[in-house]
């Protein structure tokens, strides 16, 4: 990385901004899509996400102080950082700011003053968005999430019922664009740090056990537009590395480079890019497994390969390989897929390596181990049947590896091959396999308290982490 000292030369960016906005403000206004529903218009929404310090608020201020000609409503977490001259009014635990329509076209700002915009705030967020949409005075709504928020729960808010009625928020609004801002000067280091939010004293609650890398991945994977910000503070090589990795993580996203969060507004407002089903069902790693391969990005210094096998791993041997850390997986930036462990032969192991964090989760049952009446929906059956091969059915190893030029494919494949059952072990059968030492333990039960919490969220997946010392992966 090349360290540079940031210079606040605002004159040139300001001239460039004015030049662009004068020529495009009218076009942006003309192209704003409004869909008639029950006699009123749906309110388009953009959500801004990104880790702390990435430049979200700078982007928001840039939008609010631009001559776009739109009446914009805004929901933020920290009003103090939003540069709007207005009076605060306390209303129902929310601070409401109202300004005249002539003041940069900002009509209302709602500060979520009792917490961040995340899963615990979805009900309040739903109420506030509905209020703004029903006023029918705004052309657009922008939601700025907190730096430790994930985009998915915010997007899910737009499918929730309002006060138990038959009306959904989607009847009043149209989720238009999910924007994530990435700080190119710190993102790779944060990605590979192995730290948790608790380590950095940034957790949302005392029970927040999320890792930093998982948060960064969630913010990037569930976005339509990714703003690579602060490009002026790092080398071209660093920017290309980040671009290459993100292209593999989220190949559908629109990537934009920026300095001081300055970007053409047409790229983030009224794009029409968001599709909830598409965003939630087709992550980049799954596209690789399905053959929708991201082209080799040699120019970015990023490459990928898929490891496949049709026999199970020995749990103890696999654990020993994982413990070797960077001696085997050096250069790997991301790895995910499906694994088959002999000690728990009926269970799918969800393999997940990100940065220096390695986990294997219980992802449910192989279709080959289910009875016909237990089969999932027809579409999923068809997808699984594509990977069917006798005598093992859909049981398999299928792992995507994404990394830099130092990633050693032949070494990784050799080490993983040594973890596969030998012909003699394979003949012993499942009953014997189950008696072997099993450090991974996919069949371990969640603690009752964790189970209750996840069931309340409706997101229980019977997942168990196999935690590995992250320091072993550090370069």
From Swiss-Prot:
Coiled-coil parts of chain: 440-467
Domain (CobW C-terminal) ranges: 302-420
Acidic residues bias locations: 445-460
Alphabetized UniProt keyword annotations: Chaperone, Coiled coil, GTP-binding, Hydrolase, Metal-binding, Nucleotide-binding, Zinc
Binding residues annotated for Zn(2+), in chain numbering: 116, 118-119
Reactions listed under catalytic activity: GTP + H2O = GDP + phosphate + H(+)
Protein's UniProt name: Zinc-regulated GTPase metalloprotein activator 1
Keyword Signal listed: no
Single annotated GO MF: hydrolase activity
Family in the record: Belongs to the SIMIBI class G3E GTPase family. ZNG1 subfamily.
């Amino acid at each position: 990385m090349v360290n540079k000292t940031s210079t606040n030369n605002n004159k040139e960016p300001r001239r460039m901004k004015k030049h662009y906005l004068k020529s495009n403000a009218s076009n942006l206004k003309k192209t704003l899509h409004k869909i008639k529903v029950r006699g009123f218009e749906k309110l388009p929404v953009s959500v801004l996400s990104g880790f702390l310090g990435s430049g979200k608020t700078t982007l928001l201020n840039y939008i609010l102080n631009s001559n776009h000609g739109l009446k914009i409503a805004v929901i933020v977490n920290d009003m103090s950082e939003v540069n709007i001259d207005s009076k605060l009014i306390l209303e129902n635990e929310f601070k409401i700011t109202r300004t005249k329509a002539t003041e940069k076209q900002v009509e209302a700002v709602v500060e979520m003053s009792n917490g961040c915009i995340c899963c615990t705030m979805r009900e309040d967020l739903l109420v506030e968005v509905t209020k703004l949409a029903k006023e029918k005075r705004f052309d657009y709504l922008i939601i700025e999430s907190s730096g430790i928020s994930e985009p998915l729960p915010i997007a899910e808010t737009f499918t929730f019922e309002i006060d138990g009625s038959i009306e959904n928020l989607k009847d009043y609004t149209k989720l238009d664009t999910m924007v994530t801002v990435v700080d190119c000067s710190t993102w790779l280091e944060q990605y590979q740090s192995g730290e948790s939010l608790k380590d950095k004293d940034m957790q949302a609650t005392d029970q927040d056990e999320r890792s930093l890398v998982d948060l960064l991945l969630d913010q990037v994977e569930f976005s339509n537009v990714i703003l690579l910000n602060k490009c002026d503070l790092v080398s071209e090589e660093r920017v290309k590395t980040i671009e290459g990795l993100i292209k593999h993580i989220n190949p559908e996203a629109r990537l934009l480079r920026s300095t001081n969060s300055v970007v053409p507004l047409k790229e983030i407002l009224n794009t029409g890019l968001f599709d909830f089903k598409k965003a939630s069902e087709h992550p980049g790693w799954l596209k690789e497994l399905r053959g929708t391969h991201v082209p080799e990005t040699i120019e970015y210094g990023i490459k990928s390969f898929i490891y496949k096998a049709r026999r199970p791993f020995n749990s103890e041997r696999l654990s020993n390989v994982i413990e070797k850390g960077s001696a085997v997986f050096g250069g790997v930036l991301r790895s995910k897929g499906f694994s088959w462990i002999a000690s728990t032969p009926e269970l799918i192991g969800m393999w997940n390596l990100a940065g220096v964090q390695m986990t294997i989760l219980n992802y449910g049952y192989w279709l080959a181990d289910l009875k016909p009446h237990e089969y999932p929906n027809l579409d999923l059956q068809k997808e699984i049947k594509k990977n069917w091969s006798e005598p093992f059915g859909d049981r398999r190893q299928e792992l995507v590896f994404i990394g830099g030029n130092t990633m050693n494919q032949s070494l990784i494949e050799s080490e993983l091959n040594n973890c596969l059952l030998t012909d003699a072990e394979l003949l012993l059968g499942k009953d014997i396999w189950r008696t072997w030492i099993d450090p991974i333990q996919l069949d371990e039960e969640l603690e009752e308290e964790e189970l209750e919490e996840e069931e309340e969220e409706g997101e229980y997946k019977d997942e168990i982490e196999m935690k590995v010392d992250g320091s072993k992966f550090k370069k």
